[in-house]
Design a protein with these regions (language model features):
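Aromatic-capped interface at the extracytoplasmic side
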Residues: 62-63, 104-119, 552-565
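Divalent metal-coordination and catalytic microenvironments
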Residues: 51, 128, 180, 260, ...
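Hydrophobic alpha-helical transmembrane segments in multi-pass membrane proteins
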Residues: 65, 73-74, 80-95, 209, ...
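Hydrophobic alpha-helical segments
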Residues: 2-58, 357-358, 473-484, 488-491, ...
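Non-cytosolic membrane-interface motifs at loop->transmembrane helix junctions
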Residues: 451-460
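Non-globular, low-confidence helical/coil segments that flank catalytic cores
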Residues: 165-168, 172-175, 179, 198-205, ...
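Membrane-interface helix/helix-cap signal primarily in integral membrane proteins
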Residues: 1-38, 85-88, 99-283, 654-663, ...
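Membrane-embedded alpha-helical segments of integral membrane proteins
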Residues: 36-80, 387-390, 394, 482-533
Length: 704
């Protein structure tokens, strides 16, 4: 029976004994849970994801034996859940078992990918085998394995190098030698920011950098094995397709066409990307369910229609199964050439389930198929749980499935014309997906778009009817050298989408830059949203409580008054106007841009340099904030005077003994901490690496 929240709460409480009000609540929760026992299975992916998240949230790296212990606990809990308990106890034991499994597989992935990580910057000559190419606006980024270097007795398994000269001569599988500036993979720009070092670690990359001059061809350290030859063939095919697309289309259209076909986004103009993102069209660039549905489902209906036109085949053979098989093979090829991102893999895993449902005349999308896709992804690649693409993709699809269930019931009651349903479907899909991904977009990218529905209403017909069909035709025509015409059509449609994106993103109030908030707020909102989406009875609306708590945590978040990058020379200080300012032009411009974005400030860093209350000279800068004197020393000559008069000393040089300051940070301490965020009231300094914890991807050795 469906009832409102308050009547339900009063009924639960009244059923408890006097003085034991929680008993009524617990009994009410138990009854609601038993009524929805058929949906308990939907919480197993949540338990698995929670276990993997616990691993990544650990403050120190668990020792290897913990993985074995967790697997043993998993087996024990599974065995216990099969005993003669009541169904609710068995479900709880199964959930705990899956949670421990998630922790174990995450640790096992770390053990599988663990390798040497560069601890300090250096210039060295190195050689290696090219395993991946990514063309960008600044040049060619290559991934090298079989790395050898005289200065590195234990080199990283893979390094990522930017090459600007002679890049046209490099191909996948080739051995190259070059002189490069190598650096450790970058960490977060501030506590709580995206951890790029962790992403590099789980991609097997132990160093990044750029080359001096052109790369030279060198012999390989060892011949490639069968798997290396296969992956090399795939990457070489992707690279050749990328070059052929860009040779046929102008820069902007070619870069976006490449992103849609091969998944390579490095060459997209930042202004074009910003226009699409602020118009609510960022999903066009990230291969996911939209692309896979247009390829897989579109090809299914096309092949089925073609076969149905032949009476002998239509009457005597299972043409729907044939069409489904062709669709799955095509989608598999698409995911291979597109790089197999988390969102694309999720969509591909769901495609056979969707087609099977269509063959059985059942709803194509369901929470169970989505949950199975999540389980497969998390078991194969647990680090996906930390990636924005994974989180946003599943949030959007889960919300769309929940709304689709409601829509199917409503559509039977209120029939409408095909055109009305089509327009309403695009608008509702855009609205639901935008709302579901809003917390993640605000947390990771600091932006909230307001005209996503309009952008999608204008651009999606072009995407579905022209862009994706012409992309499929161009790929099919490439082996015959006939891709020019379909690529030109694709370029025309992309130009149209860019024009629409610029129009929508240029409307007043199209986007709001939002300040950063703590991870706990995002977790609370996510758990509340899952409670609402995965249950069906009225108790689902109790999920609004953690959602409201998460919003409150986000609104109450304290912003840092001072930020220091790991180079100790890039510093931002909150001014009297409440905004961040840079005493001097920042050396680490990426960090500077991230700080402003996370502060909810849409300014370019160039517009934030200097402030009236800052006093600077050749030795450093002095500021007075909240009654505290802050000295930012850029040369060692000023340290003695700064230590005598300042409450906070930040030095780009090694620190001398300082007695007076309440807080003193020198270059080595700042580098070892990976940067700092400081609040003045109360005075507190948090290092980036302290928040990251003692993990294999965290570099704690001081930079010399």
């Amino acid at each position: 029976m469906r009832t409102g929240l308050l009547p339900q709460l009063r009924r639960w409480v009244s059923q408890g004994r006097p003085g034991l009000l929680p008993l009524g609540l617990l009994n009410g929760l138990r009854r609601s849970a038993l009524e929805e026992r058929h949906r308990w299975v939907l919480w197993l992916p949540v338990a698995l994801g929670t276990g993997t998240a616990f691993y990544f949230a650990a403050p120190v790296e668990p020792p290897p034996w913990v993985a074995g212990a967790a697997l043993g606990l998993f087996v024990g809990l599974v065995a216990a859940s099969l005993q003669g308990w009541n169904s609710l106890v068995r479900a709880c034991l199964a959930g705990m078992a899956v949670l421990t499994l998630g922790f174990a597989v995450a640790k096992l992935q770390e053990m599988r990918v663990a390798g040497p990580v560069l601890t300090r910057p250096m210039i060295t000559h190195l050689s290696g085998r090219v395993t991946g190419l990514d063309w960008g606006s600044k040049g060619l980024r290559v991934i090298l394995d079989q790395v050898r270097s005289g200065r590195l007795p234990d080199p990283p398994a893979r390094v990522r190098i930017l090459i600007q000269k002679g890049a046209d001569q490099i191909s996948v599988g080739q051995g190259v030698g070059l002189t490069a500036q190598l650096m450790p993979p970058p960490g977060p720009s501030a506590p709580g920011d995206n951890d790029f070092g962790r992403a590099a670690f789980f991609a097997g990359i132990g160093a990044t950098g750029f080359s001096f001059g052109a790369a030279q061809s060198t012999p390989l350290a060892r011949p490639p094995g069968s798997w290396d030859r296969l992956t090399g063939f795939v990457e070489d095919m992707r690279a050749r397709m990328t070059l052929r697309i860009r040779a046929q289309l102008p820069k902007s259209e070619g870069a976006i066409a490449t992103a849609i076909i091969t998944g390579e986004r490095g060459g997209i103009d930042p202004d074009d990307e910003a226009a699409l993102r602020d118009a609510g069209l960022a999903h066009v660039l990230a291969i996911a369910g939209l692309h896979m549905a247009l390829v897989g489902a579109g090809l299914f209906w096309l092949v089925r229609a073609a076969l149905a036109a032949i009476p002998a085949l239509a009457l005597g053979y299972p043409i729907k199964k044939w069409a489904a098989s062709v669709s799955i093979v095509a989608a598999a090829f698409y995911i291979v050439i597109s790089g197999a991102s988390s969102s694309a893999t999720r969509a591909f895993v769901m495609l056979p389930m969707m087609l099977s449902a269509i063959l059985l005349d059942r709803p194509a999308l369901s929470m169970r198929s989505l949950g199975l896709a999540a389980v497969i992804l998390l078991l194969v690649r647990p680090v996906s749980i930390t990636e924005p693409g994974f989180q946003m993709s599943f949030a959007a699809v889960a919300s769309l499935v929940a709304v689709a269930e409601w829509e199917q019931r409503r559509a039977r009651l209120i029939p409408h014309s095909w055109l009305y349903r089509h327009i309403r479907g695009i608008a509702l899909t855009s609205l639901v997906a935008s709302f579901a991904t809003l917390p993640f977009a605000m947390y990771y990218f600091g932006r909230a778009t307001h005209y996503a529905v309009l952008g999608n209403l204008l651009a999606m017909p072009l995407m579905g009817l022209v862009t994706m069909p012409s992309a499929a035709l161009s790929v099919a025509a490439m082996p015959f050298g006939l891709e020019h015409a379909p690529l030109q059509l694709m370029g025309w449609s992309i130009d149209g989408m860019l024009r629409l994106g610029r129009f929508v993103s240029g409307l007043p109030g199209a986007v709001t830059v939002t300040p950063a908030f703590p991870l706990s707020a995002l977790v609370s909102i996510t758990l509340g949203g899952l409670w609402i989406l995965l249950w069906r009875l009225s108790w689902r609306w109790w999920g609004l409580v953690p959602v409201a708590a998460g919003i409150a945590l986000a609104l109450m978040a304290q912003r840092p008054d001072m930020l220091i990058a790991s180079d100790a020379r890039t510093i931002a200080l909150r001014g009297e106007d409440g905004r961040l300012h840079f005493p001097r032009p920042p050396k680490d411009r990426f960090a500077a841009a991230r700080w402003l974005l996370r502060d909810g400030d849409g300014r370019d860093w160039r517009d934030a340099v200097g402030e009236a209350s800052l006093s600077c000279d050749g030795l450093g800068c002095i500021a007075d904030r909240n009654g505290l004197v802050i000295a930012m020393s850029s040369r060692p000559e000023s340290l003695e005077a700064d230590c005598d008069r300042a409450d906070i000393v930040v030095s780009a040089a090694p620190l001398i003994p300082c007695a007076k300051p309440r807080l003193a940070l020198g270059a080595r301490q700042i580098a070892d901490g990976g940067g700092y965020a400081i609040t003045l009231s109360p005075l507190r300094a948090i290092s980036v690496n302290r928040q990251r914890g003692e993990r294999p991807w965290v570099i704690t050795e001081p930079v010399q």
